[in-house]
A protein has these predicted regions:
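Short, exposed beta-strand/loop patches in secreted or surface proteins that constitute
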Residues: 5, 25-28, 58
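Basic/aromatic-rich interaction segments and small domains that mediate binding to polyanionic partners
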Residues: 21-48
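Short polar catalytic/cofactor-binding loops
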Residues: 17
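Mixed-charge, Lys/Arg-rich low-complexity intrinsically disordered regions
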Residues: 1-7
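Intrinsically disordered, low-complexity, charged/polar segments
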Residues: 42-61
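Coiled-coil-like amphipathic alpha-helices with heptad-repeat character
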Residues: 6, 29, 49-53
Length: 61
């Protein structure tokens, strides 16, 4: 998915390195060209660059 198409508050699926898929919400940008996501219960915070977003994040269906 293109990073410029992300919507704050939108739900997405992140595919981890081991193949497991995790539902995450986009919570904004950190001002450094990186994108911040949280899991549904906000237990984990992920910060991705645009390459990771393009390769491993897709829209929630």
């Amino acid at each position: 998915m293109d990073a410029n198409k992300l919507i704050i508050g939108g739900r997405y699926i992140y595919q981890m390195l081991d193949g497991k898929e995790v539902e995450v919400s986009h919570t904004g940008n950190d001002g450094d060209g990186r994108y911040v996501f949280h899991t549904r219960r906000r237990m984990y915070r992920f910060v991705f660059g645009p390459d990771t977003v393009r390769d491993r994040v897709r829209a929630y269906e």
